[in-house]
């Protein structure tokens, strides 16, 4: 009978030993998954380097876009806010709203865009150019969706005509 008792003890010990080996692995995997899920959008975009590379390409696309160039207010706005300045301001803004360390120092969206007379179509063109820049630098779909959700919240402050 003592042998049987020992067998139960051994089986329990084996289960505990297996649990002792598997539990840290499972907890480690959960920690990695949680760390990724909790990492900021800023970090997932590659930090300031990733953001500035995409923004640089995006602003260059906007400056060259024929549809946007037909809007005289946008064309005039480029004289007061040249591309290098826009690249800085947009990078700073994206950095802040995605959880990065930057502090946006530019004007609020509504007053800084009101004079540009941006239409719904021009908004869509800008969104398309942004998507092209994100795709060019292989920004993953989840991060793109998060960015477009953030950008979408500014539409009411930027679009002033149908």
What do these predicted ranges mean?
Residues 35-162:
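Core of compact, soluble alpha-helical bundle domains
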Residues 13-17, 145:
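Hydrophobic alpha-helical segments, especially transmembrane helices
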Residues 1-14:
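N-terminal secretory signal peptides that target proteins for export/translocation
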Residues 14, 32-36:
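Elongated fiber/stalk and passenger scaffolds
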Residues 17-30:
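Bacterial N-terminal signal peptides
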């Amino acid at each position: 009978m003592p042998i049987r008792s020992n067998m139960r003890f051994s089986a329990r010990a084996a289960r505990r030993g297996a649990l002792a080996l598997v539990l840290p692995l499972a907890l480690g995997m959960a920690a990695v998954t949680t760390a990724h899920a909790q990492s900021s959008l800023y970090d997932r975009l590659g930090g300031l380097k990733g953001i500035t590379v995409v923004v640089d390409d995006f602003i260059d696309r906007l400056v060259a876009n024929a549809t946007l160039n037909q809007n005289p207010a946008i064309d005039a706005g480029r004289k007061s806010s040249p591309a290098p300045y826009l690249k800085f301001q947009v990078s700073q803004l994206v950095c802040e709203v995605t959880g990065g360390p930057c502090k946006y120092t530019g004007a609020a969206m509504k007053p800084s865009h009101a004079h540009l007379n941006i239409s719904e179509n021009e908004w869509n063109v800008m969104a398309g150019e942004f998507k092209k820049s994100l795709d060019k630098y292989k920004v993953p779909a989840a991060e793109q969706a998060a960015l477009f959700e953030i950008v979408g919240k500014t539409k009411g402050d930027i679009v002033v005509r149908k």
